[in-house]
């Protein structure tokens, strides 16, 4: 590597990115077409310890975008989406103070319309009486 950052730093940045990925429900990553996942470098100026980034495409709000999830010093996340919406306009929302258990819901909110997600979180159950 031509970077001056020691390998141990890269390893811990990769662990941070992997931890974030594990905190996002797999169905959320699949539904937004998450691909080209990578880790983010720490940024003392922004008080960011590292993070996860990935591309998304063909969501109900976003045609194509890059998502950045940054781990902040206060142990919350900042989620940035930078891309193009379905009307081909610039789309750059930010959510701050996101806790790990909120990541899936926040990503759904940033990438999908309410109409698209209204049935996703409601389990459909049919009760059948078994005679025996």
Model-derived features with residue positions:
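Negatively charged, low-complexity tracts enriched in Asp/Glu with abundant Ser/Thr
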Residues: 2-61
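Mixed-charge, Lys/Arg-enriched low-complexity segments
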Residues: 2-8, 86-132
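Intrinsically disordered, low-complexity regulatory segments enriched in Ser/Thr/Pro
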Residues: 63-98
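Short, Lys/Arg-enriched charge-dense amphipathic segments
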Residues: 59-65, 111
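Surface-exposed beta-strand edges and flanking loops
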Residues: 56-58, 71, 81-83, 129-132
């Amino acid at each position: 590597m031509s970077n001056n950052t020691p390998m141990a730093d890269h390893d811990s940045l990769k662990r941070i990115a992997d931890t974030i990925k594990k905190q996002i429900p797999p169905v959320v990553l699949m539904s937004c077409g998450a691909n080209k996942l990578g880790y983010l470098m720490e940024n003392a100026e922004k008080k960011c310890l590292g993070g996860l980034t990935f591309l998304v495409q063909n969501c109900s709000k976003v045609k194509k975008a890059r998502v950045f999830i940054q781990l902040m010093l206060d142990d919350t996340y900042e989620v940035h989406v930078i891309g193009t919406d379905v009307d081909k306009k610039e789309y750059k929302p930010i959510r701050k103070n996101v806790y790990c258990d909120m990541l899936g819901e926040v990503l759904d909110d940033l990438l999908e319309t309410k109409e698209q997600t209204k049935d996703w979180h409601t389990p459909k159950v049919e009760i059948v009486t078994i005679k025996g």
